Amino acid sequence: MYFPMELKHNPTGKDDIDAEREHREEILGELAESMNESTESPEGDEEKFNSEPSAELEALLPYYSQVEDEALKVAKKYFHGTFIANSQNVNGQKLFEYAHNGHTYRCYVDIYNENEREINIIEVKATTISKYIYKEINKGGKKERKGLYFTDAHGGNPYSLIIKDGNIWRFNTADSKVNDYALEKFEEKKKYLLDKYRKEGKHPYDLAFQRFVIEGALRKAGDKRPVNYYLAVLNSEYVCDGAVDENGKRVYNNVDGQEIITFIELNETTKAYQETILKEIAILESYISTPHDVSKKVDVGEYCAWGEKTECRFWRHCFQTLRGVPDTNRANNYVYCKGSFNEGKIENKYQLVNEGYWTFDDVPMDWLVKENHKIQRDCYDNGAEHVDKEKIQYWFDQLEYPIYHFDFEGFPCPLPRFKGERPYAQSVFEFSLHIEREPGICDKEKDNFIFLNEECYDDERKALAKAIIDHFEFNEDGTLKGTMLAQFTTYEKGRLEELANLYPEYSKKLLAIRDKSADLLHLLRNNKEMYEEMYKKEYENKYGKPYEDIIMEMPNDIKKKMKAEMKKAGEIINYYHKDLGGSYSIKKTLPVLVPSLTYKGMDVGNGVQAYIAYINYDSDEPTFNTLKTKAKRRDALKRYCQQDTWAMVEILKAVRRKIK
């Protein structure tokens, strides 16, 4: 977007139109969003990209260009005629200009295709088809429905909103006619694509603006050919077969009917968006022609992504009152705050801000009805430290020694790098392991093992998998001797499963590690299933019978009280300190619990920097201005990954001291 200097409100300070720069910044933003979507980490973790352009994102631009190149290759299989595309320079793309009310609107088309009968506009995005289609996943032993779908009754049969026709996804009009209920829900879900603030509606909105410009330009040119609009996205169902060309370069063949790129037809959606586009253009033009009050209060919402890594770059304008508020005192630091304040009248953290409750202590005490919020507020107001010794001790009691403090580093490459990988698969290249054989007995160097790929472009996953099982100990029955510990075990367990599927000879032991794990988040934050089970065991030990039998024998009022207490045990946080700021990422907990240990000043200081250093192994350009050689990059990666597992060792020591 272009903001001329003469305008009163020019937040970006731009004074010229630079299409290449604009396009580059747009791509960087898309990359940040797509990479963050692919990152399996708890909400608020720092292992994500900022929305601002950065050296880390710049290093990933070649991968985005590859996505555009692959999209063109696949498009040529399914569309006929001539093509105009250029992944390296936006000025080589098809340009449309449309003059409207004295203003000129421009758009470049990623892939322009035309023939005598029609024009096809293809907008390439580095995201995947996953968010748009129905899928069923297994979560904690329960099936969970994801994506865009509708049903034929309340809780009835699910149908995907869009279905595949060849390699093009279109609205599922056939199943919408099953009955009136299905048709109603089908129309409701279609509207998700018309909400630019939803993850499903953002990209259709971009394409709809292009439609406004393109069709305006074509009308003036007298071109009456029909125009079709498509998103080209990565196919999350595609599994790389490992094929390469004669030069050893990866080739993405059609594998079992799946292409690496798939298309979503959005003619109906982009047409329905035009009313919104015209209204917003009228507002934009009024801002240009008429001075307006830029200090006027603007309501904030989910679209601001406030406090997240991808927060809007203009938040300092809309959140002017928050400029001087320290992170630890932001109102959004209350955990699980949806519908939690003022008897549910305050829906979320954005409504808090819109109504003038900007800081932690702005929120009235009588609004705090949830126990967690009362704990947080007490810690903030009084400098207290919350430690639930009983629950923390229960967590320690579940551990079997030795403890394997374990951490993977992976690269979520947009295009799969090796056989068996999908788009944005976490391609693991390093792990660190600290072995704690008895409580508190672990040496940072002697009890540590690190595996790090020798090369970036070689598939070393088999050697990595073997190194894992060689450094864990197993019982005669094949089970793990001890407990694998990680921060957010979902990530480590997922990678172990993937390696087990790739290498059957190592499968049994890799899955044995997965099946005996503990999570540092469950120690410090909470875990519903674990601590509800703790509550049940206390009653079973007291009465000598199963919990279900005990509760059946209780009067209704006692039964109700017991259920409430069990729910409370599963929800209340185990540990809190005001400096956590509502986050339990290791970058927050470490300074609080082990202030002598820090990531500050490290050449590689987070997971993003880790894989950027890895993919730049052989680059002649300095990485982060200090890592000028491959040897230095490898050394920095080893020290960073070692720090992750050593931090877990030290955190356990610190927590043990607090419950003595």
Where are these regions (language model features)?
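Conserved RNase H-like, two-metal-ion catalytic cores of nucleic-acid enzymes
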Residues: 68, 72-79, 121-123, 128, ...
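A short acidic (Asp/Glu
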Residues: 133, 240-244, 414-419, 492-502
